[in-house]
Regions:
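Short amphipathic alpha-helical segments
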Residues: 19-43
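Ligand/cofactor pocket segment of small-molecule handling proteins
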Residues: 1-2
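Eukaryote-biased recognition of C-terminal alpha-helical segments
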Residues: 104-110
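Short, glycine- and small/hydrophobic-rich beta-strand elements in well-ordered beta-sheets
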Residues: 35-56, 60-64
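Active-site-flanking beta-strand signature of metal-NTP-handling nucleotidyl enzymes
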Residues: 6-12
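An amphipathic, aromatic/His-enriched active-site/gating alpha helix that lines ligand/cofactor pockets
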Residues: 41, 62-102
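Beta-strand elements of well-folded, non-transmembrane domains
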Residues: 13-15, 63
Length: 113
C-alpha cells in the first residue's frame, strides 16, 4: 500500500449567510469531474469543515503528491476551471496566504502520539 500523509489547509468565505448556504449546497453535489480530478492528483480522502466563515480542508495524500502538478492539471481541465470560477465568488484567501494562493497550508503544532 502507498504511504500517505495528511495536509490541512484553511480559507475564509465571504461573511454572508446566504452565500455560505449556497457554498454548502454546491458541496453537497460536487461535480463528478471535480471529484475525479481530486482522486487523479493523489488525494485519497478530503473533508472540509466550517466554523463561521472559516474553512479547514483536511486531505490525505500519497507521499509523492505534488500540489503544483495538481494545479497544472486543474488548469488544463475546463470543467475544473468552471468549478473553481464558481467557487471563487464565495472564497476569500486568508491574510497570511501568499499572492495567488487560495487555500493556505497550515502547520501542525501538536500530535497526540
Amino acid at each position: 500500500m502507498t504511504a500517505t500523509r495528511r495536509l490541512c489547509l484553511a480559507l475564509d468565505l465571504t461573511d454572508d449567510a446566504d452565500l455560505i448556504a449556497d457554498y454548502e449546497r454546491h458541496h453537497r453535489a460536487v461535480w463528478p469531474e471535480v471529484k475525479a480530478g481530486i482522486r487523479r492528483a493523489g488525494i485519497h480522502d478530503m473533508e472540509i469543515w466550517r466554523v463561521g466563515d472559516r474553512l479547514v480542508m483536511i486531505i490525505e495524500v500519497t507521499d509523492d503528491f505534488d500540489p503544483a502538478a495538481k494545479a497544472e492539471a486543474d488548469a488544463a481541465d475546463p470543467r475544473i476551471r468552471q468549478w473553481e470560477a464558481l467557487m471563487a465568488r464565495f472564497q476569500r484567501p486568508l491574510p497570511q496566504a501568499r499572492p495567488g494562493e487560495k487555500w493556505a497550508a497550515m502547520t501542525r503544532i501538536f500530535k497526540l502520539d
